[in-house]
């Protein structure tokens, strides 16, 4: 069978089997299948002449090997619609020929029926839209339902444009569409020129010991003071020297109770010993945070090029991912639990897995008179009201691993996740792709198929 070539906006090209008896509108519907450009948005031209939807391809003497051009032009649709009532009634025979042809985009079942009866169309869809073709072959009703809903939404927007292009509702939708296009272009630019920004970044950890107990310290230049959890202080046997006069509430991304302060204890980095002051927090996920107080005091150099922390004459290597499995697994479970709680309580969505926010506050005041019980109590009250020690969010895990329970976020809705799973994508990867695609399931599917 002869084929014709159709250029889409001079960017993409598709091959279509030539059927001289079919109308121009039928040809546009086939193009709509492969490009999702609505029929009303298509302007089909041959040698610069616009083709009429009502006429057959044979009326324009179109033959195999001809080259047709399709451009998107929303403004042409109202003119065509307005001209239709003025046209005299055509003979009944052409209309009767088109009556049996149903719009295959009305429902998922219509799509399946159409491609079952037209295998040559399915072959073209396999080449142009693999995700849709896979859904048709596997009879994935969820994917097809979503596809039909998208087409109907596009048609609704088109109807609004025809009815009142300057109306508030259409202008709002048009603005959202333009904004989404700009976002997609920005993301595509980033994926092409700086793909590394989509990779997970691991926090900086080093090996150290507190009071002779080995620890993995989280190096955080955004933490104003060095912090330790209450449980870690017990393991390091320094709970007995916690000064509870420095208790209060630490406020940052969240809140945590400060039970006190250890004014000085031994910190071993490499082969050197340093004195460190610690704020002890009751509910702190990270065992030990090496804060800016120590980093500035000892003029620490964070050499990210060589992957080392230089303090005095010591050079301590930052830990690699393989050394942080226990920490990352714990943080991953915490992240999933927080996401479930946030979803259940309809709270604001949390940050994505590739973002970690660090917030610090001012340090506590030193008691003015440690020998007077009265002064101690007064200073204790002042610390409760005015003291804001540092608190920073724990580093977030790389990527959630598959779990029996569904995990969603603001971009990865359960329906979109199931759509990608139906394409053969794992749940974990589906969530990550939807997050990167800002919830656009089509973009996520394209990323999955490469």
Curated annotation (Swiss-Prot):
Arranged from A to Z, the UniProt key words for this protein are:
Aspartyl protease, Coiled coil, Hydrolase, Protease
Residue ranges for the region (Disordered) are 78-116, 335-410
Bias (Polar residues) occurs at 104-116
Which molecular function terms from Gene Ontology are attached? aspartic-type endopeptidase activity
**Coiled coil segments of this chain:** 321-346
Keyword set includes Coiled coil: yes
In the record, which residues are listed under signal peptide? none
Residues of the active site are 220
Q: Where is the composition biased (Low complexity)?
A: 78-99, 343-386
Q: Please give the CDD domains that the UniProt record associates with this protein.
A: RP_DDI, UBA_cnDdi1_like, Ubl_ubiquitin_like
What broad class of enzyme is this?
Answer: hydrolase
Domain UBA: where?
A: 411-450
Per UniProt, residues of the Ubiquitin-like domain are 2-77
Q: Which InterPro entries does this UniProt record tie to the protein? A: Peptidase_aspartic_DDI1-type (IPR019103), Peptidase_aspartic_dom_sf (IPR021109), UBA (IPR015940), UBA-like_sf (IPR009060), Ubiquitin-like_dom (IPR000626), Ubiquitin-like_domsf (IPR029071)
Instruction: Name the Enzyme Commission number(s) assigned to this protein.
Output: 3.4.23.-
By sequence similarity, the record places it as follows: Belongs to the DDI1 family.
Q: What does this protein do?
A: Probable aspartic protease.
State the protein's name. Answer: Protein DDI1 homolog
Q: Which organism is it from?
A: Dictyostelium discoideum (Social amoeba)
Which taxonomic lineage is given here?
A: Eukaryota, Amoebozoa, Evosea, Eumycetozoa, Dictyostelia
Recorded name of the encoding gene: ddi1
């Amino acid at each position: 069978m002869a084929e014709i070539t159709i250029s889409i906006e001079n960017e993409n090209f598709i091959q279509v089997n030539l059927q001289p008896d079919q109308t121009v509108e039928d040809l546009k519907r086939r193009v709509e299948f492969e490009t999702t450009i609505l029929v009303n948005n298509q302007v089909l031209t041959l040698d610069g002449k616009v083709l009429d939807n009502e006429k057959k391809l044979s009326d324009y003497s179109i033959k195999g090997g001809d080259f047709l051009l399709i451009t998107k032009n929303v403004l042409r649709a109202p003119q065509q619609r307005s001209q239709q009532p003025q046209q005299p009634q055509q003979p009944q025979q052409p209309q009767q020929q088109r009556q049996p042809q149903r719009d295959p985009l009305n429902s998922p079942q219509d799509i399946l029926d159409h491609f079952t009866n037209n295998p040559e169309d399915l072959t073209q869809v396999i080449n142009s839209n693999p995700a849709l073709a896979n859904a048709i072959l596997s009879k994935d009703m969820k994917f097809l339902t979503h596809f039909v809903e998208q087409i109907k939404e596009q048609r609704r927007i088109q109807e609004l444009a025809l009815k009142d292009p300057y109306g508030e509702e259409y202008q709002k939708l048009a603005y959202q569409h333009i904004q989404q296009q700009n976002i997609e272009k920005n993301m595509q630019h980033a994926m092409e020129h700086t793909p590394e920004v989509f990779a997970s970044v691991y926090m900086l950890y080093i090996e150290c010991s507190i009071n002779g107990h080995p620890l993995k310290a989280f190096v955080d230049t955004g933490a104003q003071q060095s912090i330790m959890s209450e449980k870690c202080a017990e393991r390091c046997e320094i709970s007995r020297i916690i000064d509870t006069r420095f208790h209060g509430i630490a406020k940052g991304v969240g809140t945590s109770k400060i039970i006190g302060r250890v004014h000085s204890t031994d910190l071993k980095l490499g082969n050197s010993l340093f004195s460190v002051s610690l704020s002890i927090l009751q509910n702190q996920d990270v065992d030990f945070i090496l804060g800016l107080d120590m980093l500035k005091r000892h003029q620490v150099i964070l050499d990210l090029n060589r992957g080392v922390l230089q303090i005095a004459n010591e050079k301590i290597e930052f830990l690699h991912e393989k050394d942080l499995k226990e920490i990352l697994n714990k943080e991953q479970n915490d992240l999933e639990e927080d996401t479930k709680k946030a979803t259940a309580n309809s709270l604001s969505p949390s940050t994505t897995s590739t973002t970690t926010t660090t917030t610090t506050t001012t340090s506590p005041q030193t008691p003015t008179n440690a020998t007077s019980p009265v002064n101690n109590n007064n200073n204790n009250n002042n610390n409760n009201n005015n003291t804001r020690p540092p608190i920073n969010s724990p580093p977030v895990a790389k990527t959630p691993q598959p779990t029996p329970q569904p995990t969603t976020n603001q971009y990865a809705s359960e329906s979109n996740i199931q759509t990608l799973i139906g394409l053969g994508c794992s749940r974990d990867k589906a969530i990550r792709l939807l997050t990167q695609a800002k919830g656009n399931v089509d973009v996520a599917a394209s990323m999955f198929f490469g």
